[in-house]
Amino acid sequence: MKLKELLSEDTDVVSGVIIYSKDKILLCLRTNDGDWSIPKGHVQVNETPVKGAVRELAEETKIYIPESELELVSFGMRTKSDGTPGLLYLYKHEAAGQYVPTLDHEHEAWGYFTVGNYPKPLDKILKGVIWWIFVLNIV
């Protein structure tokens, strides 16, 4: 086990927020893999998934949305980069207007995109979830 893993307060749970306004979704371009995705990241030890989503959103974009304004829309298994399983929680937030993020080092660009008209490459898990939520209205 690496020292970073021993000192880490992160869990195998990832949590994120889908911010949408009218028919557009906020996406950020990740610097590590070049995929477009929503602000999301690892939940820390002794942190609930929704608290992790709020924290990650604030850290990555400087946008603060209270827990009470987030709705859980997806929960499921994910495959981590090392091939082992983890959990993924996704929340959505309907904004009255479009927030302007201030990005951290994890992202290099951002934009609001119409559902179905995404930049490429789009995070593969996210594409399916957006389809369920906004096109099929399952959630």
What are these regions (language model features)?
Residues 127-139:
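Charged phosphate-binding loop/patch that engages nucleotide di/tri-phosphates or the phosphate backbone
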Residues 5-25, 73-75:
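Conserved N-terminal beta-strand and adjoining loop/helix that marks the start
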Residues 43-69, 74-129:
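Unchanged
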Residues 20-60:
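Conserved Nudix-box catalytic region and its N-terminal flanking loop in Nudix hydrolases
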Residues 14-15, 33, 86, 108:
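A conserved catalytic-core signature of glycosyltransferases
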Residues 1-9, 138-139:
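Short, Lys/Arg-enriched, disordered terminal segments
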